[in-house]
Amino acid sequence: MARRFLCTIILLFAGVLTLSAQSLPDGLYARMQTNRGTILLELEFERTPLTVANFVGLAEGTISHSRSGSPRFFDGLRFHRVIADFMIQGGDPLGNGTGGPGYTFADEFHPQLRHDGPGVLSMANRGPATNGSQFFITHVATPWLNGAHTVFGRVVEGQNVVDAVRQGDTIQSVRIERVGPAAEAFQVDQQMFNRLRTEAAERR
């Protein structure tokens, strides 16, 4: 009897979680599973289409990259740099801050996307137009990074997980969720990414 009751509770809880995912507002999301828990990120695909196309293409394995053994670029990588009360950084296949996908692309700065609080998703770089696969998520506002690093999303659930991540923790998977027609239409392939990359380079 107790076992049956427990199974019922588990099924009801799973149903609530599924409903929560289905009830997200229209948008493009990345569900990042870590060994500390899940981080749900909303991606700014309309304001920073190139940067989001890069992230989505790497996550889904639909654009070419230099990491061998896994088409889904981020799965299994570690948070190689964590600074308390600042940010967590991942996306480096080498795990030492020097790795990337084998290419770089231009910055995308939008006036309404700022490093204005906790949970900002932004690109790590080595200077102008050196974006690749490394990203960071903030613990606090970091306004000195505005105009130097491309903001392309924000945590909508799981900031407590961001705050719990420690250096060396693992990104177990990144899965993209599309809600609504605009997000559904944002399908990334190599041709789309190349076009956006060329257009951004020509605007510099």
Regions found by a protein language model. Name each.
Residues 2, 13-204:
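Cyclophilin-like peptidyl-prolyl cis-trans isomerases
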Residues 1-9:
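Bacterial N-terminal signal peptides that target proteins for export
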